[in-house]
Amino acid sequence: MIKHKRLRRASALFAALSALLLSGCAPSAASDSALPALTVGSDTYPPYVYMDNNGDITGLDVEIAEEAFRRMGYRAEFTTIDWEKKTELVDSGEIDCIWDCFSMEGRENDYQWAGPYLVSRQVVAVDAQSGIETMSDLAGKTIAVQATGKPEAIFLRGGADVPAFRNIISLADRGVQYAMLDCGYTDAIAAHEEAIRQYMKDYGANFRILDEPLLVTGIGVAFSKNDTRGLAAQLNEVFEQMREDGSMEKLVGKYLDDPAHSLEVDALEQ
């Protein structure tokens, strides 16, 4: 009988200790959820931002944002937006920032920027069996791009360094351009290189990326020009910390097969 009492006491003590240990592990998640939220406007753009099999938003930019904002005393709350209305949304305060592999090139004066925190190449992809080998081969061809994206701006701007294409198809849903190339409805597409590679990996698409990039650019986080909270400056400081302590490299390596090029931010300034 005494042994049974001791056993029950030991079991109760173990249960109490377990509860204490579990409650000790919980504050991190609980404290994060209690932090004030910053609403991040984004679009679906694997591997940077996408929905996993559980229906949760994840990706490289999501994890960087969560870690960076946590260090600033905030939590990141991602929301999918109409990409064509991104500037209107951030200026109205409906979202706090735009964060989704967002190219800074040519938009330097449109927002308050944090970044660049990574490097991205804007490239052209064609069907693997296509006879298009160089940019000059795009003359007379149809190219699909995302509306208001950087490739659209490059092609519509024109110039000596831009091929004399026949037609540009601008799409509100950036994912549609991949399907169009896959089905032969366009001769080429233009987008961030890692996004194209992710589509090829996920769907087994037989694309070929042209060697010559359209643009090598820094990607950043855009806040409204009228924002007075100093968030862009704080985020720049955190990005520097994350580069120095290796956490940025660790996160990039989790999503990209060859992370080294994406981390060469300093080379952009040379």
Where are these regions (language model features)?
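Extended ligand-binding regions for polar small-molecule ligands
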Residues: A26, V62-R71, I132, S136-D137, ...
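Extracytoplasmic small-molecule ligand-binding "clamshell" domains
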Residues: S31-C101, S170, Q234, D245
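Ligand-binding cleft/hinge of the Venus flytrap
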Residues: M51-N54, A65-Y74, P151-A172, M200-G204
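C-terminal motif of bacterial Sec signal peptides marking the signal peptidase cleavage site
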Residues: L21-G24
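Periplasmic-binding protein-like
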Residues: S42-T44, V119-V126, R197, K201-E240, ...
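A ligand-binding cleft/hinge motif common to bilobed small-molecule-binding domains
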Residues: K85-E88, C101-D110, I154-G159, M180-D182, ...
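Short helices/loops that flank or line small-molecule/ion binding pockets
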Residues: R70-R71, T79-T80, E84-C97, Q112, ...
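Acidic, polar ligand-binding/catalytic clefts
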Residues: E66, R75-D137, R208, P213
